[in-house]
């Protein structure tokens, strides 16, 4: 049974400077909630209540967000503004939060390895908060993946089709189709040129990982820019036939780009905020 979810959140968010100069990109608001809150809500919906966050310098506001603000709550007590804190109070009450720092930015694989003390020796999820995933017609993306893990008991990556010219932005997989939405991975390439990509099936920021991934990351040699990529460690797992790729149901917004961030804001405003589902 998966109980833990890891959130790598130590990056600089340079694509959103100067907004992220003094604020983590994970705290950027989509209408009335920061990205990280949407992500933790998704984890809790999937039954994952033990939250680990890998932070860096200048990320204290992440910890403050998932803590009680006594002064604020006293100020708005017995007013109609109390309803705005119902969602975050639920997360504070129902989740446990633990934090560790990634001292150097050495890629996603290194960030996940940094979170090892928070996870221990058990399967866990990884969520990249700037990939906002929403499914208004059923289970959240992470809940879909947890159900799949309970069936197959192996590492799983979420994928979606992308335009061929955009494969150089993603890890890209190819593999044997098990059913329409599931592939057994046999090839995984990090940010290939379009002409070298094995497919247009791109990995997005949702993973279920088995604990042996930590040792595999430790054995992975740094690549371009000295970064350790999670795709390299996952490829080692795939060679043993134990990595699945899942075409999830729902919408994904790349909130690491201005275009995706605006698209997400418009979608959430129309479908969540205006309908009273955004708290």
UniProtKB/Swiss-Prot annotation:
Transmembrane segments: none
Keywords assigned: Nucleotidyltransferase, Transferase
Enzyme Commission identifier(s): 2.7.7.9
Entry keyword annotation includes Repeat: no
Pfam families tied to this protein: NTP_transferase
Biological-process GO terms, alphabetical: lipopolysaccharide core region biosynthetic process; UDP-alpha-D-glucose metabolic process
GO MF annotation: an example: UTP:glucose-1-phosphate uridylyltransferase activity
Reactions catalysed according to its record: alpha-D-glucose 1-phosphate + UTP + H(+) = UDP-alpha-D-glucose + diphosphate
Domain of life: Bacteria
Function: May play a role in stationary phase survival.
Similarity-based family: Belongs to the UDPGP type 2 family.
Protein name per UniProt: UTP--glucose-1-phosphate uridylyltransferase
Name of the gene encoding the protein in the UniProt record: galU
């Amino acid at each position: 049974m998966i109980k833990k979810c890891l959130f790598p959140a130590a990056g600089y968010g340079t694509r959103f400077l100067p907004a992220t100069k003094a604020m983590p990109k994970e705290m950027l608001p989509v209408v009335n909630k920061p990205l990280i809150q949407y992500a933790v809500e998704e984890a809790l919906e999937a039954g994952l209540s033990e939250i680990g966050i890998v932070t860096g310098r200048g990320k204290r506001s992440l910890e403050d967000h998932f803590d009680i603000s006594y002064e604020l709550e006293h100020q708005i007590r017995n007013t109609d503004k109390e309803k705005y804190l119902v969602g975050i109070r639920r997360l504070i009450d129902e989740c446990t939060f633990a934090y560790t720092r990634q001292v150097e930015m050495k890629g996603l694989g290194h960030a996940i390895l940094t979170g090892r003390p928070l996870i221990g020796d058990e399967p866990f999820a990884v969520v990249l908060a700037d990939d906002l995933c929403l499914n208004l017609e059923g289970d959240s993306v992470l809940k879909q993946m947890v159900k799949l893990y309970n069936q197959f008991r192996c590492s799983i990556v979420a994928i979606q089709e992308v335009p061929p010219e955009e494969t150089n932005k993603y890890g890209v997989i190819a593999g044997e189709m098990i059913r329409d939405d599931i592939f057994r991975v046999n090839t995984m390439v990090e940010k290939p040129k379009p002409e070298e990509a094995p497919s247009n099936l791109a990995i997005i920021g949702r993973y279920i990982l088995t604990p042996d991934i930590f040792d595999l990351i430790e054995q992975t040699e740094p690549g371009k820019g000295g970064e350790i990529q999670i795709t390299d460690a996952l490829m080692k797992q795939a060679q043993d036939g134990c990595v699945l790729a899942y075409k999830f149901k729902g919408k994904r917004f790349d909130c690491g780009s201005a275009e995706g961030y605006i698209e997400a804001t418009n979608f959430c405003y129309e479908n969540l905020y205006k309908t009273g589902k955004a708290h």
